[in-house]
A protein has these predicted regions:
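Short, well-ordered loop/turn sites that connect or cap secondary structure elements
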Residues: 120-121, 140
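Glycine- and Gly-Pro-enriched alpha-helical subdomains that act as flexible
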Residues: 124-134
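Short, intrinsically disordered, mixed-charge
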Residues: 107, 122-123
Length: 209
């Protein structure tokens, strides 16, 4: 599947805020957004465009897509599935995105970014309930256990990432067992616990047109 392969810092500049797409680098002084927080392009510095209602909704959708690293067609499929579930469609959408295997690996601290998590999954380093899974978009269910294969437990990228994880910072819908290098998707997250600043209702309005 085709994916964006250009400079990810430009995506943050396009949205006008940090999307934390490069892990620890995003909180370091080397972060490009700190030096160039304006939109990319020749006229980015002086560009001040007042967005229409549609433009605001579109930007919100693009922001969520870029945070989770998802293409448009796949994002539409998630929205369609969220719309069929009971409850608030926008919140259902975020819960589905949070239940992706690559996102959960990132949230557990096994990877420093979702992009790195996708690479680790594709390289067959993880199992779910004891079964090898190499599909980053695999959707987890409450009770699913994510483990690192025995042969992969010495990976330097894994330990470099885990050194920065504190137990008290773990997300309430996840359980991390550092000694076993495994985690559990305990339950669906509450919207208030999902740490991304988006107005998902704008996405619902966009797709409802």
């Amino acid at each position: 599947m085709a994916r964006y392969t250009g400079p990810v810092c430009k995506l943050c500049r396009r949205e006008g805020e940090k999307l934390f797409l490069k892990g620890s680098r995003c909180v370091a002084v080397k972060c490009s957004f700190e030096k160039k927080s304006y939109a990319p392009g020749q006229h980015g510095v002086s560009q001040r465009v007042k967005l229409s209602e549609y433009g605001i909704q579109l930007r919100e959708k693009q922001k969520v897509r870029r945070i989770y690293g998802i293409l448009e067609k796949q994002f539409r499929n998630y929205f369609a599935k969220a719309d069929q579930l009971k409850g608030v469609t926008g919140e259902n959408l975020l819960r589905l995105l949070e239940s992706r295997l690559d996102n959960t690996i990132y949230r557990l601290g096994f990877a420093q970014s979702r992009k790195q998590a996708r690479q680790l999954v594709r390289h067959r380093h993880f199992t779910v309930n004891g079964q090898l899974v190499d599909i980053p978009s695999f959707l987890l269910k409450p009770g699913d256990i994510i483990s690192v294969k025995d042969k992969s437990k010495k990976l330097s990228v894994l330990h470099d990432s885990m050194r920065k994880v504190r137990d008290e910072d773990m997300y309430p819908w996840l359980k991390l067992e550092k000694a076993q290098i495994q985690g559990t998707f305990v339950d669906w997250p509450n919207r208030t616990d999902i740490p991304i600043q988006v107005q998902e209702n704008l996405i619902v309005e966009l797709y409802s047109k």
